[in-house]
Amino acid sequence: MLVVLLGPSCSGKSTFQKELVENEGYHAVRTATTRPKRVGEDLSSYYFLKDQSFAEWEVRGDLLCVETFRGWRYGVPRDEITRRGGRPNRVVILTPGGVMELLSRHPDIITADALSILYLGVDGATGEARACKRGDSRREYLRRMAADSIDFRHYPRENCVWEFTPDYILDCINNPQNYKLKPRLKRVERKRK
């Protein structure tokens, strides 16, 4: 099974991914980026590549769902997302654009696997508290919210038309341990296709 997590900044995607890895035996799909490692960031969270290496991976077709954000490039290594090995269940964090690319341009990955798309939502107060806790400045949090308002303009709100339908929409739950994946997934709302 391939689980795709998406949601705005500070919605708990990384925390939920960590829970799936540690408690459910999932493999965390490691993405590639040209941005530098943040202070205190674990080297295993990304493949940190120089611009030239990233471009070479992209030209070879080794990267999927490539996007640019604030001048830094991000992509998903094909072998990471298709890896099955000893941990057949994988979890990846994608942007809405990444999900659209996965659905429209990579049917080989989708048909070879069960695919679940989970949208994690967050309210403003909780998101801001989480950003502060992880050391983001208020300015950085507001910048992220502005970017999210563009990236997620088609996502959960009343009478919304979705570009794609997530399998589950999880409301903001302050305790990430309340998030569980199938069959123990807390099913908050199911959107009909």
Sequence positions of predicted segments:
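Hydrophobic anchor at the beta1->P-loop junction of P-loop NTPases
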Residues: L5
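P-loop (Walker A) phosphate-binding loop of NTP-binding proteins
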Residues: P8
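ATP-binding Walker
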Residues: S11
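Walker A/P-loop
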Residues: S14
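Post-Walker A helix-loop "phosphate-sensing" segment adjacent to the P-loop in P-loop NTPases
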Residues: E22-R30
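ATP-dependent small-molecule kinase phosphotransfer cores
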Residues: T33-R90, L94-G98
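Conserved phosphate-donor/acceptor-positioning beta-strand/loop module used by diverse small-molecule
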Residues: N89-P96, I109-C132
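Small-molecule kinase domains that catalyze NTP-dependent phosphoryl transfer to phosphate-bearing small molecules
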Residues: C132-K193
